[in-house]
Amino acid sequence: MFLSNRLMHLRYLLLVAVCVAVPALSQNICRISHREGFSNCSILSLAQDADGYVWAGSCDGLNLWDGHYARNFRLSGNLVQEIVATDDGYLWVRTNYGVDRVDARARTAELHAYFPRVYQYTARSRDEAFFLYKGRLYGYVASESRFEPLCGVDADDVLRICLDPDGVLW
């Protein structure tokens, strides 16, 4: 009897503790749409840059969300399929017409529209980016601001590429 009363009190205490803790853990959820300046409501990709800003890729361009309003960026293609944020403040953005490099701090873009339909790519910094295009592996040459095929690499059977923290391409 004493044990069942004690168990009942413990359950009651646990219920009160949960009810008090849940509001403390809740976060504000708000709906963000074209009213806040987004170019399109269909968001296909999201990334957070090194400064904490959120970048959203939509069916009509790249959008920078500052917490209150969205700013739009036009790239090599309107359909932004993937965004990779690097630790040094850059974004590599895959569109339907190529892979573009965006300086997140200066808010400028370097367009590379000559590589449509890139499906796999990886990046680690503003100067390190690789992607597969038509069975070949391409690397970014920072000194010339362009991509070139890597010699001796046949990528027909490669399904995924990635860079490890040491800069080794897998």
Please tell me what each predicted stretch does.
Residues 1-170:
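Carboxylate-rich, polar loop motifs that coordinate divalent cations or form catalytic acidic clusters
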